[in-house]
């Protein structure tokens, strides 16, 4: 029998935070029908024609080859990558998002008769986004972490986005791997007409916050926190895989 649970966590209290006006746009963006459209429009048409990165060619193979026995997926979206990755029934899967609608959709999509699936509502930008037991209990640490098309949506400077890798490595095993992709806003090829329209719309509507996001700073942050780092720029997309976190003594 499958096990699907949902938890809310914060760094200061055990009760869920009250919604704020700032959270409300995300509630509107991640309604179920828009999440369905997301798969077709964003991951299919826009990623290929605007950003020059075909998901099925570049990102799904990377995802499939880097899922461990205890996997953490950050930024649930629609659960598309997890669904396409053909997660093993023996994998313990934890899905994280700061928005309940998206997380519930991903959890429902990834249900498996055997797989143990756990959902957490939390803010990944916080220094300690998970309960203390994830730090003290090695059995709860993750051997693989994924974050696809997440970083360009976070409304913080690129330096704050880079700190996520510092926070995450504390929750990973010694041989753990983190992998993902995000749309860059700086130091990439010139946008075609379609990309210009999409980028302008995403920025104006607060979907993208990536004007200063660049490959150099992301790669530097990865190399500061992991022993083995591989990065690629595919079209306007930064793709990465980093292994073996540099853990503090």
Swiss-Prot record:
Compositional bias segments (type: Low complexity): 1-15
Known EC number: 2.1.1.-
Entry GO MF terms: methyltransferase activity
Keywords on record: Methyltransferase, Transferase
Enzyme class: transferase
GO biological process: methylation
InterPro entries: Methyltranfer_dom (IPR025714), SAM-dependent_MTases_sf (IPR029063)
Catalytic function, reaction form: 2-acetyl-3,4a,8,10,11,12a-hexahydroxy-1,4,4a,5,12,12a-hexahydrotetracene-1,12-dione + S-adenosyl-L-methionine = TAN-1612 + S-adenosyl-L-homocysteine + H(+)
Pathway: Secondary metabolite biosynthesis
Region (Disordered): 1-26
Keyword Amino-acid biosynthesis: no
Function: O-methyltransferase; part of the gene cluster that mediates the biosynthesis of the linear tetracyclic TAN-1612 neuropeptide Y receptor antagonist. The decaketide backbone of TAN-1612 is synthesized by the non-reducing polyketide synthase adaA via condensation of one acetyl-CoA starter unit with 9 malonyl-CoA units. The FAD-dependent monooxygenase adaC then performs hydroxylation at C2 while the polaketide chain is still attached to the NRPKS adaA.
Protein family according to the UniProt entry: Belongs to the methyltransferase superfamily.
Protein name per UniProt: O-methyltransferase adaD
Origin species: Aspergillus niger
